[in-house]
Amino acid sequence: MKEKILLGGYTKRVSKGVYSVLLDTKAAELSSLNEVAAVQNPTYITLDEKGHLYTCAADSNGGGIAAFDFDGETATHLGNVTTTGAPLCYVAVDEARQLVYGANYHLGEVRVYKIQANGSLRLTDTVKHTGSGPRPEQASSHVHYSDLTPDGRLVTCDLGTDEVTVYDVIGEGKLNIATIYRAEKGMGARHITFHPNGKIAYLVGELNSTIEVLSYNEEKGRFARLQTISTLPEDYHGANGVAAIRISSDGKFLYTSNRGHDSLTTYKVSPLGTKLETIGWTNTEGHIPRDFNFNKTEDYIIVAHQESDNLSLFLRDKKTGTLTLEQKDFYAPEITCVLPL
């Protein structure tokens, strides 16, 4: 069986925008790199249920988000919503409210867009974060993530301030702060993912290479720390920046990518999700594994390397969580986002 995977990334060198590849699950092989949409710096991409593709984007007006109608093969441009400044770094769809959320790293902003009848977008709210952290990379707010909690609130991660902010979403797309969780100073809060039970979350720190295991109180929208665990081996002392974090749909295994150590860390998750145990590290066979994702059956993990321009394919043992390399040299330039269809 062949599955399609969408890829987003930078367009600084050779990439033209969004691409697709095919995964042959029987042959354990990636093939057929094809251009889907020409867009500048689509570093994060997402789809809604109607087949609209939303990407981070830049144009002559500045940075923001681009909308496309995607038929499974090609994408028709519906328009950009951009403002002065750098593009977004994360986009997510809220199907229930028909909204799209965006995180702007450089401006320290959270943006909300309303999906129009044809799939195009209209900006409805912008929230500016303020503050800083102790590290040189934290001179100001850097919102790196904006997506939904299991109970339908919006949660953001701010790498610059080490804060995780939970918002209530009001009306046609206005944000009101519900709670703020303050992670360890200098962590560099980048992304967060939730256990399938909706009561536990895992916050990854780009700057200190750790994961904080958090309880989540749905009634109040409040996080509390349960555990902190490293993403690196004890004997590694080189540079590293953690990037992506994913949990299997059965809640048994968690994975993170390490840029510098150039590995995936595999964790065993306790039955209630409250504790992580490190299983080991897998060399990703490339440089700067910015993103990775499961295929739709979670039998495979596809890893994208931003600097070495290759995808690696790993077979995943669902019983043990361990990874076996199947392919490491598939060319895909400047990729920073992997999205299975």
Swiss-Prot record:
It comes from Lactococcus lactis subsp. lactis (strain IL1403). One of its GO terms (cellular component) is cytosol. This is Uncharacterized protein YwcC. It holds the Pfam family Lactonase. Gene3D superfamilies: YVTN repeat-like/Quinoprotein amine dehydrogenase. GO terms for molecular function: 6-phosphogluconolactonase activity. Belongs to the cycloisomerase 2 family. InterPro entries: Cycloisomerase_2, Haem_d1_sf, Lactonase_7-beta_prop, WD40/YVTN_repeat-like_dom_sf.
